[in-house]
């Protein structure tokens, strides 16, 4: 599962899961995703790991794939979403929630577009998840050109965030399923064994230490300790 904050412990988990799947000659890898996002560097490491495997990959968005979660989902070959799920809103922000520089936005905008394009998704919609200033008159969805009055449900000047139904309409999601078993049924896979890969102790330690709150406390403790030494 790829859940909660995307931190530097998750790339190790994803890479280990992919290596295990390749060793066991698995036919499919499903990533169970529910996240509001996290670190850009961790997300790009995860994206690179997923993109590098020859095994078919599926993102199962179990409620939400926001910010970094969108990039990870788009790196998979297919996307399935539960009813009422969301994907999008991928602008790069700092820990205070303030928008980062145009350089950072430009990088993420094209990273999202390239990732979507590689997976056969619409790169312009992916760009719009990062850049609120983009608008649309035409979209190519599954080879058909659609005339649109911007993205349905999108408020003016806002990042694109798609519900399950809209993600399917615009070709971002491949289907709707309420469980991994339903995903497999949709793919007409009947004879299967599900192997779940969870965090090991080292990945869990990295997740704890790179959690923004814990990192801030460590930094504060280090600063206070330095002050004590100076006074001593």
Where are the model-predicted features located?
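Hydrophobic alpha-helical transmembrane segments
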Residues: 214-220
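Juxtamembrane/start-of-transmembrane alpha-helix segments at the extracytoplasmic/lumenal side
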Residues: 207-214
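Soluble extramembrane regions of membrane proteins in the secretory/endomembrane system
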Residues: 1-206
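Cytosolic catalytic cores of cyclic-nucleotide second-messenger enzymes
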Residues: 232
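Conserved small/polar residues in nucleotide/adenosyl-binding loops
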Residues: 221-228
């Amino acid at each position: 599962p790829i859940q909660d904050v995307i931190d530097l412990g998750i790339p190790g988990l994803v890479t280990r899961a992919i290596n295990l799947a390749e060793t066991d000659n698995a036919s499919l890898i499903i990533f169970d995703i529910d996240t509001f996002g996290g670190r850009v560097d961790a997300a790009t490491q995860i994206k690179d790991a997923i993109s590098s495997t020859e095994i078919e990959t599926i993102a199962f968005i179990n409620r939400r794939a926001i910010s970094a979660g969108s990039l990870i989902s788009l790196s998979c070959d297919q996307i399935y979403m539960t009813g009422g799920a969301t994907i999008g809103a991928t602008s790069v922000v700092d820990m205070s929630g303030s928008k980062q520089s145009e350089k950072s936005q430009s990088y993420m905008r094209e990273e999202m577009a390239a990732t979507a394009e590689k997976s056969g998704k619409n790169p312009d919609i992916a760009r719009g998840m990062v850049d609120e200033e983009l608008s649309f008159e035409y979209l190519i969805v599954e080879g058909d050109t659609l005339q649109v009055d911007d993205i349905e449900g999108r408020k003016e000047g806002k990042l694109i965030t798609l519900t399950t139904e809209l993600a399917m309409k615009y070709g971002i999601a491949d289907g709707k399923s309420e469980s991994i078993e339903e995903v497999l049924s949709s793919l007409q896979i009947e004879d299967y064994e599900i192997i779940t890969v969870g965090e090991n102790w080292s990945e869990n330690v990295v997740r704890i230490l790179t959690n923004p709150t814990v990192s801030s406390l460590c930094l504060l403790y280090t600063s206070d300790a330095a002050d004590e030494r100076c006074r001593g």
